[in-house]
Regions:
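N-terminal amphipathic/basic-hydrophobic helices that include classical n-h-c signal peptides
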Residues: 1-15
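A conserved regulatory-domain signal marking ACT and ACT-like small-molecule sensing domains
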Residues: 14-201
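Conserved active-site and cofactor/substrate-binding residues in soluble primary-metabolism enzymes
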Residues: 27, 31, 69, 73, ...
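Short glycine/serine/threonine-rich phosphate/pyrophosphate-binding segments
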Residues: 32, 124-126, 212-215, 367-370
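Active-site neighborhood of HAD-like aspartate-dependent phosphohydrolases
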Residues: 196-246, 250
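Long, charge-rich alpha-helical interaction segments
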Residues: 237, 250-258, 268
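C-terminal cap/substrate-recognition subdomain and adjoining C-terminal extension
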Residues: 258-416
């Protein structure tokens, strides 16, 4: 609604029953909601529903009411009092049949759609909204979860997230179509049921290489050992699912024979964390999460991250060492894709946590079973085969954007 020259738009009142939707807009200031409801209380109004939002200091307040007196006199009284406060008001009738339908829809499934990008453009929201409508869903609410974005901020450092609360039953193809749209728009889109477990997860497990750290440790070891190109080629085949993980691991480790523990220590000290890791772990600790590294990588480096980040559990493969040098062998048993999923399930049982309350995050083909087993599986900056087979993917933002999928806003985290 546009307000020009401080003039209040004319109120339209179409009224035949005692149900009315009152919309009030204007520049926000402390006490407005108290003022409005005080005015309504004098008319003996029952509030059936209420919602309020403030965007850039402008108030939009909606109140669904039941009035005991529906003559023009009290309505004009409400109008005059609201306008005297410098606000705009619009009163519309609500059909009793539609109201009854609204009540009966209570308890219907709701879905949360999370839209993430460095900056969110109108074209992004338009495309997503069109697809929501095309699949027969209705948007009940849109909420910004990310912090306020400075106009002069670098796009590489900014992040934006809005959350859509949807009403209705999503058709089977909804998620797949949204994932295709996300790729076209170069954004991330996550869809999940708005159930009791969404904000009550309790255990989160991470792959290590290319998830918690922005590198593949075995490739770093290979460079120092002088076999970088050979190992990188095998790693790529394994992570894209073109080579059995167990076989690829043994092949790569055999090429590291003779590498010193001292060289491993130097690599461990310079492991680069992925974007948002420290922010995420700070929030997870505050929320009381149990954290785990479940990796096909190596315990030596997992233990280093455990100390740096305060991780609760580390499960990874152990490199055999004799006389302070690698033998080129892996201590059995090897942690492969199945083992990862089994470890997650065992950890949940040990901690007394339902699998619906678990989260798994990974990027490679050997993470797929773990992602599928978790209550919330997230493919993080993952290979194409992993994104395609995962329900959720984050490819444009840092690891801390996982908090948005849990419904946690920047404001909530920053205030602690």
């Amino acid at each position: 609604m546009l307000i020009r020259d401080n003039k209040i738009p004319v109120v339209q009142m179409r009224f035949m029953n005692n149900l009315a939707l009152i919309n009030i807009t204007g520049r926000d200031k402390p006490g407005l909601t108290a003022l409005v409801t005080s005015i309504l209380s004098e008319m003996d109004v029952t509030i059936l529903d209420i919602g309020q939002a403030v965007i850039h200091d402008y108030l939009n307040l909606g109140i669904l009411t039941e009035l005991t007196d529906v003559t023009q006199e009290p309505l004009q009284g409400i109008r005059a009092a609201i306008e005297k406060a410098g606000l705009s008001i619009n009163i519309n009738k609500v059909d009793e049949h539609r109201y009854t339908q609204w009540v009966q829809q209570q308890g219907r499934r709701r879905t949360i759609l999370t839209l993430l990008s460095r900056k969110i453009k109108a074209s992004h929201v338009s495309a997503v909204s069109v697809m929501i409508a095309e699949h027969g869903l209705n948007i009940d609410k849109i909420t910004r979860l990310s912090g306020r974005i400075p106009l002069a901020g670098s796009e590489k450092k900014t992040r934006a997230c809005v959350e859509f609360s949807l009403r209705g039953e999503p058709p089977a193809e909804f998620r797949e179509n949204l994932m295709a749209l996300a790729g076209k728009l170069d954004v991330d889109i996550a869809v999940q049921e708005d159930g009791i477990f969404r904000r009550h997860r309790r255990l989160i497990a991470f792959d290590m290489d290319s998830t918690l750290i922005d590198t593949e440790v075995i490739d770093e070891l290979a460079v120092v050992a002088g076999v970088g190109s050979q190992v990188s080629a095998i790693t790529e085949l394994a992570m894209t699912g073109h080579l059995d993980f167990h076989e690829s691991l043994c092949q790569r480790v055999s090429l590291l024979k003779g590498l010193s523990v001292q060289a491993m220590a130097e690599i461990a000290e310079r492991l680069p964390l992925t974007e948002g890791v420290e922010v995420l772990f700070s929030a997870l600790k505050m929320l009381g999460y149990k954290t785990a590294i479940i990796s096909g990588g190596f315990t030596y480096f997992g233990d280093n991250l455990k100390a740096r980040l305060g991780v609760d559990y580390v499960y990874a493969n152990e490199l055999e060492v004799v006389d302070a040098k690698l033998t080129g062998e892996v201590v059995r048993p090897v942690i492969d894709a199945k083992a990862k999923a089994d470890i997650l399930s065992e950890l949940a049982r040990k901690e007394g946590i339902a699998m619906e309350q678990t989260i798994a995050v990974g990027d490679g083909a050997n993470d797929l079973e773990m992602l599928a087993a978790a209550g919330l599986g997230i493919a993080y900056h993952a290979k194409a085969i992993v994104r395609e087979k995962s329900d959720h993917a984050i490819s444009r933002l840092g690891l801390d954007s996982i908090l948005f999928l849990l419904g946690i806003s920047d404001r909530e985290h920053d205030n602690h």
